[in-house]
Design a protein with these regions (language model features):
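Auxiliary Fe-S-binding modules of radical SAM enzymes
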Residues: 1-38, 105, 203
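Short, charged low-complexity linear segments at domain edges
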Residues: 18-38, 46-67
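Short, intrinsically disordered, charge-balanced linker/junction segments flanking boundaries
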Residues: 62, 72, 79, 200-205
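Acidic/glycine-enriched edge-of-secondary-structure segments
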Residues: 88-95, 182-188
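FAD-binding FR-type
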Residues: 72-75, 96-102
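Conserved AdoMet/S-adenosylmethionine-binding subsite of the radical SAM
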Residues: 101-104, 108-205
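Cysteine-centered iron-sulfur cluster-binding motifs in ferredoxin-type domains/subunits
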Residues: 41-54, 66-89, 127
Length: 205
């Protein structure tokens, strides 16, 4: 792979927000499929990849977006003045910014479920490594509460972002998306060589 291609698909420079504020698009409670026990999953917004099969396409853009649900639209035209005036809720905002303190308060509401089920908190996306500094600080706080931590990641970021975060986790759900280097580069926009090297480093932790 040429250095220019590596730059094009890198997520080295994507992280632009302050490290005490994250951009998320959902908090899902009572999940049974994102790690051990009952888990609360925080979905981070923003992903450097373009997987055709993406389960959360609303997570790809790092921007806060507004979408219209056609089935809810009354065709009243009030949105022409201001989308926030929509009486039927046809307009939905995808994404919001949240502080460390606010997110900690939000997930700790579920602490009783974590303790009784052996569950905890999973950080997903999008791609959590695009907001690695925030995620690391957040998991450090959860560790002080004794909460089990996990991340779900495609692993396509510098090891300096991945490894400090992974060392705070009880589980790393590593989403190895594709094993063909050309398709990884051209279709998914992924640096497969870096992904595999990060996986090798993870298994040594």
């Amino acid at each position: 792979m040429t250095s220019s291609a590596g730059q094009r698909i890198s997520c080295n420079v994507v992280e632009t927000r302050r490290d005490d504020v994250a951009r998320i698009f959902n908090i899902q409670r009572y999940s049974l499929n994102d790690g051990e026990g009952i888990r609360t999953v925080v979905f981070f917004k923003g992903c450097p990849h373009l997987c055709p099969w993406c389960a959360n396409p609303e997570s790809i853009s790092g921007k806060i977006q507004t979408v219209r649900r056609e089935a809810k639209c009354l065709h009243c035209a009030k949105c022409l003045r201001d989308a926030d005036e929509c009486p039927s809720g046809a307009f939905e905002r995808i994404g919001r910014d949240i502080s460390l303190d606010a997110l900690e308060r939000e997930v700790m509401k579920d602490d009783i479920f974590f303790r009784t089920s052996g569950g905890g908190v999973t950080l997903s996306g999008g791609e959590v490594l695009m907001q690695a500094e925030f995620a690391t600080r957040f998991l450090q706080r959860l560790r002080l509460w004794g909460v089990s931590c996990a991340i779900e990641t495609a692993g396509d970021a510098p090891a300096s972002k991945l490894l400090p975060l992974a060392k705070l986790c009880d589980e790393v759900l590593f989403d190895l998306k594709i094993m063909d280097a050309a398709q990884a580069r051209d279709v998914v926009k992924m640096n497969l060589q870096r992904v595999l090297e990060n996986l090798r480093l993870l298994v040594k932790i």
